[in-house]
Amino acid sequence: MKKEAKSQVVSEMAQKLASCQAAFLADYRGLTVEQVNQLRGELKKVGVEYRVVKNTLLRLASKGTDAECLSEYLQGPNAIALAEEDPVGPAKVLTQFAKSNKAFELRAAELNGKLLSIDEVKALAELPSKEELLGKMLGSINAPVSNFVGVLAAVPRTFVQVLAAIQQQKEG
């Protein structure tokens, strides 16, 4: 790789590392091309970029970013998954993929500048996603309003039922 191409990769990765919320390092040795493509597709669905970058270039790109804490794990072949928004989605995909593919191994992760252990990544994968949490919160906010509307609608409904019963009583 030429020096210009390397510097372009470093600047591109530095930009992505600075803007991402979480980064996951994994050892991909032993995976087939089909398995890597499957993983890329699953990660793309949750808005995550998955790349293989040389360790030296990744080390240079991570300097001065939150992901600098991952430098100690940059040994051997590594792939990096970058999550710009919700870190729970990629954690779920990567831990599930690691369970089903023994050759794939998560090495480390970084979340907003904090180095996460593999156990912490697994715990993160157990959390509900941002969308699920927002749905639950909106449901909680909406429930009292819905109940209040139901109570307000019950008054005219029971009044109509009473009138219908009186009418039936007079007819029958």
Swiss-Prot record:
CDD domains: Ribosomal_L10. The keyword Ligase does not apply. Pfam families: Ribosomal_L10. SUPFAM superfamilies: Ribosomal protein L10-like. GO terms for cellular component: large ribosomal subunit. The keyword Ribonucleoprotein applies. Keywords: Ribonucleoprotein, Ribosomal protein, RNA-binding, rRNA-binding. GO terms for molecular function: large ribosomal subunit rRNA binding; structural constituent of ribosome. Belongs to the universal ribosomal protein uL10 family. Part of the ribosomal stalk of the 50S ribosomal subunit. The N-terminus interacts with L11 and the large rRNA to form the base of the stalk. The C-terminus forms an elongated spine to which L12 dimers bind in a sequential fashion forming a multimeric L10(L12)X complex. Forms part of the ribosomal stalk, playing a central role in the interaction of the ribosome with GTP-bound translation factors. NCBIfam families: PRK00099.1-1. This is Large ribosomal subunit protein uL10. The gene is rplJ.
